[in-house]
């Protein structure tokens, strides 16, 4: 149970906030609100869920250890009537711009445009890690040469075998075909009455709060 001091801002928000309408997504009909995807980030989410210890240090430890042995997969992507093949380290679908903790995997994503922002990280070398890490936290990862990005309303990801996916950091096993779609204007949220008209970080603040509870 979270401490009362943590809940106080939210009880105030429920009493005095305004209702706004934003997008959310579905991955094989499972709702997500910020990001979902396949590949390395999903694999790390699975390993993290099995760890006896929690917290950001455990997550960092799992990320570093697993990155040394993880092998990229080849995916077929179907969207807007076309099919593309990519060998990818990860494929992230963003409704919001970041995973959490200021790691911006889809820096151009917004919560009210009715589109998924898809980020593909192609295979890279150890020499690429410093720039990728810096750009991930500097909102410029979409400018890296190892990154491919596009926008769509629906996306089918086909892989050679079933495996793990993640939705908002939670792992789940799914089949060879993974269907991702955006649900435009499908979610009502409460925002602070005195906030500027900008919902780009509403769900992200909620996601950071939820992540904090998971690490307790």
Q: Where are these predicted regions, by residue range?
A:
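Glycine-rich phosphate/pyrophosphate-binding beta-alpha loops
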Residues: 37, 41, 92-107, 171
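Short acidic/glycine-rich loop or secondary-structure boundary segments that cap or lie
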Residues: 41-44, 85-87, 99-102, 126-129
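Gly/Ser/Thr-rich active-site loops/lids in small-molecule metabolic enzymes
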Residues: 50-58, 107-128
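Catalytic core of DAGKc-family lipid kinases
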Residues: 11-89
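ATP/nucleoside-binding phosphotransfer catalytic cores, i.e., glycine-rich phosphate-binding loops
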Residues: 79, 85, 110, 120-216
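Short amphipathic beta-strand/extended segments with alternating polar/hydrophobic composition
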Residues: 7, 32-35, 83-93, 166-169, ...
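A residue-level signal for conserved active-site and pocket-lining positions in enzyme catalytic cores
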Residues: 25, 44, 91, 118, ...
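Short, small-residue-biased leader/transition segments that mark boundaries at the very start
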Residues: 1-13
């Amino acid at each position: 149970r979270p401490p009362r001091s943590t809940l106080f801002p939210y009880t105030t928000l429920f009493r005095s906030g305004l209702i706004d309408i934003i997008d959310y997504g579905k991955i094989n009909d499972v709702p997500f609100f910020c990001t979902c995807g396949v590949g390395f980030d999903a694999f790390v989410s699975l390993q993290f869920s099995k760890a006896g210890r929690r917290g950001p240090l455990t997550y960092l430890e799992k990320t570093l250890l697993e990155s040394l042995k993880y092998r990229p997969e080849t995916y077929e992507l179907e969207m807007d009537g076309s099919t593309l093949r990519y060998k990818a380290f990860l494929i992230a679908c963003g409704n919001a711009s970041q995973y959490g903790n200021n790691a911006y995997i889809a820096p151009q994503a917004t919560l009210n445009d009715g589109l998924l922002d898809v980020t593909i990280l192609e295979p890279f070398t150890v020499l690429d890690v410093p720039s990728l890490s810096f750009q991930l936290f500097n909102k410029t990862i979409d400018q890296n040469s190892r990154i491919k990005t596009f926008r769509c309303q629906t996306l089918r990801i086909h892989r050679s075998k079933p495996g793990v996916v993640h939705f908002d950091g939670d792992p789940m096993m799914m089949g060879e075909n993974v269907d991702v779609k955006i649900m435009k204007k499908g979610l009502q949220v409460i925002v602070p009455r005195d906030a500027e008209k900008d919902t780009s970080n509403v769900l992200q603040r909620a996601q950071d709060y939820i992540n904090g509870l998971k690490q307790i």
